[in-house]
Swiss-Prot record:
EC number: 7.1.1.-
The keyword Membrane belongs to this UniProt entry's keyword annotation: yes
Domain of life: Bacteria
Classification via InterPro entries: NADH_UbQ_OxRdtase_su1/FPO, NADH_UbQ_OxRdtase_su1_CS
Taxon lineage: Bacteria, Pseudomonadati, Pseudomonadota, Gammaproteobacteria, Pseudomonadales
EC supergroup of this enzyme: translocase
Physiological role: NDH-1 shuttles electrons from NADH, via FMN and iron-sulfur (Fe-S) centers, to quinones in the respiratory chain. The immediate electron acceptor for the enzyme in this species is believed to be ubiquinone. Couples the redox reaction to proton translocation (for every two electrons transferred, four hydrogen ions are translocated across the cytoplasmic membrane), and thus conserves the redox energy in a proton gradient. This subunit may bind ubiquinone.
Reaction catalysed by this enzyme: a quinone + NADH + 5 H(+)(in) = a quinol + NAD(+) + 4 H(+)(out)
Pfam families to which the protein is assigned, alphabetical: NADHdh (PF00146)
GO biological processes: aerobic respiration
Name of the protein described by the UniProt record: NADH-quinone oxidoreductase subunit H
GO molecular function: NADH dehydrogenase activity; oxidoreductase activity, acting on NAD(P)H, quinone or similar compound as acceptor; quinone binding
Keywords linked to the UniProt accession: Cell inner membrane, Cell membrane, Membrane, NAD, Quinone, Translocase, Transmembrane, Transmembrane helix, Ubiquinone
Main location: membrane
């Protein structure tokens, strides 16, 4: 097998790693539905799903079978091509955003020098999915939900980007591995960039349209918003894409502010995946806890909060960080 050169083997191993990691992220996103319902039931002092399998563990399998056999219906008044394209973009954008996150020193999909910029590009692409879904459905509730979503996402993506500029200024690189290595030799960025972390976390919740920033799909006001005409696997792609977004934002918080795969104080460096998974699971639980504990504000309050609170806080954090970096360089 002379054609099996070392270069080809290296490419095949890299492709296999990418497939395994992305499939694992999709499976985690699907399983989060069950985890969320069990945790919400626990926190709200009720049972939650407990009928299908031991402790309700097969509930997600039952849901997937039900979703698979539902009618894949497209409204006759919809723009069919864009209607079908929207959930694909929503799912693919969040999955591709995870590709730049290093899980361990040797495991990751892509090691890009412009990793953070690639994440911003994928986050911006997800806005098109929501707009396409609302416009192509030819439904007033879907259109209102998509307009809300686009305005909210574009607003909070400004702070999502600005919150990370303090980290980039200190490290001097957009590469995610460089950021993790910097934190291994210095303080985790949760301490010097605490305000940047707070803003990034708030913006991350808003960009994923999670409670309390789930205005685009507010059931009481918009009858599920831009999802209203979707059913079956198309709705399932939106559904899983939202949970993949939670996993992606949680993993980014760990990578950018909590040392990535490193344990606290250099503890047990032999198990990098354990530390990464543990910290990511913690932030996923925080996402779920927000749904269980915080009421949904009005849409105007959400937008006012973004521009009147998040923007000044982010700019002050960026100015102070820039001044300190310049002072240290002189």
């Amino acid at each position: 097998m002379n054609w099996l050169t070392p270069e080809l083997i290296e490419i095949l191993v890299a492709v296999l790693k990418a497939i395994v990691i992305l499939l694992a992220v999709v499976v985690c996103g699907a399983l989060l539905s069950f985890v969320e319902r069990r945790l919400l039931g626990w926190w709200q002092d009720r049972y939650g799903p407990n009928r299908v399998g031991p402790f309700g563990m097969f509930q997600i399998a039952a849901d997937m079978i039900k979703m698979f056999f539902k009618e894949d219906w497209t409204p006759p008044f919809a723009d069919r091509f864009i209607f079908v394209l929207a959930p694909m973009i929503a799912f693919a954008a969040m999955l591709m955003a995870f590709a730049i996150i290093p899980i361990t020193p040797t495991w990751g999909v892509a090691d890009l020098n412009i990793g953070i910029l690639f994440f911003f590009a994928m986050a911006g692409l997800s806005v098109y999915a929501v707009l396409f879904a609302g416009w192509s459905s030819n439904n007033k509730f879907a259109l209102l939900g998509s307009l809300r979503a686009s305005a909210q996402t574009i607003s909070y993506e400004v702070f999502l980007a600005l919150a990370l500029m303090g980290v980039v200024a200190q490290v001097g690189s957009f590469n995610m591995r460089d950021i993790v290595d910097y934190q291994a030799q210095n303080l985790w960025f949760i301490i010097p960039q605490f305000f940047g972390f707070c803003t990034f976390f708030i913006a991350g919740v808003a960009v994923t349209h999670r409670h309390p920033f789930d205005q685009p799909e507010a059931e009481q006001e918009l009858a599920d918003g831009y999802h209203i005409e979707y059913a079956g696997m198309k709705w399932g792609m939106f559904f899983v894409g939202e949970y993949v977004g939670i996993v992606t934002i949680s993993a980014l918080l760990v990578t950018l502010f909590f040392g990535g795969w490193h344990g606290p104080f250099g503890l047990l460096p032999q198990i990098p995946f354990f530390w990464f998974a543990l910290k990511t699971a913690f932030f996923i639980m925080i996402f779920i806890l927000l749904r269980a504990s915080i009421p949904r504000p009005r849409y105007d309050q959400v937008m006012a909060f973004s521009w009147k609170f998040c923007l000044p806080l982010t700019l002050i954090n960026l100015l102070v960080t820039g001044a300190l970096v310049l002072a240290a360089a002189q």
